Amino acid sequence: IVVIEQKSHLVNGLTVGDNVFVLSGVERRWLLHTQSFRGRLQELEQAVGVDIPCNRQVEELSLFERCMVELLKAWESGARLVLLWNISHFLAGTDIGRLHYAIRHFASRGMAFIYISNSYEELCGLCDRIAVMYNGSVIKVQEMVSGGSEDIHALLQQFTGTTSSPPRSAMSRGSICLNLS
């Protein structure tokens, strides 16, 4: 599991290539085949629409570029699940769109994502399923049928207008909310 959030998990003082390959557990191959890994990074970057030089220092990267390098590192290390934590709090709208493009690219290749956000507009058209949480508990899980905001509006209407706590869902402790098989 990899977490991408405002606090970067990349190592300052190292290059993009060092962070993606050396620190993702393929250091022997990186030392032996530096040139081929630079080509591999360029292929990944082209697939998701970014251009970050392999030899660039991590501390020189923008927040968006750091997110993209962390995503590339997750892919290269074989991570099956990426948790994105309140990305819209620190990325601009155009960068979020570019990140969503990369998420779709990796999701189509088998990587799973949990996207935590307070902005339901941000989730429209990206998520297959939305979970509404209250005080740390999942109270409702909704499949996204139309892929638009009407799915989320319908889900949220169930919980608006009440001054008391939202109702507990039928999900009990121990029931499966997410299956990664």
Where are these regions (language model features)?
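Helical segment within the ABC ATPase nucleotide-binding domain
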Residues: 96-109
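Short coil-to-helix "N-cap" segments within the ABC nucleotide-binding domain's helical subdomain
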Residues: 26-46, 63, 93-94, 144-149
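Conserved catalytic segment of ABC-fold P-loop ATPases
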Residues: 125-132
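H-loop/switch region of ABC-family ATPase nucleotide-binding domains
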Residues: 117-118
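C-terminal boundary and immediately downstream tail of ABC-type ATPase nucleotide-binding domains
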Residues: 43-49, 149-177
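Q-loop/switch helix immediately C-terminal to the Walker
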Residues: 7, 12-26
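Hydrophobic anchor residue at the start of the ABC signature
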Residues: 67, 71
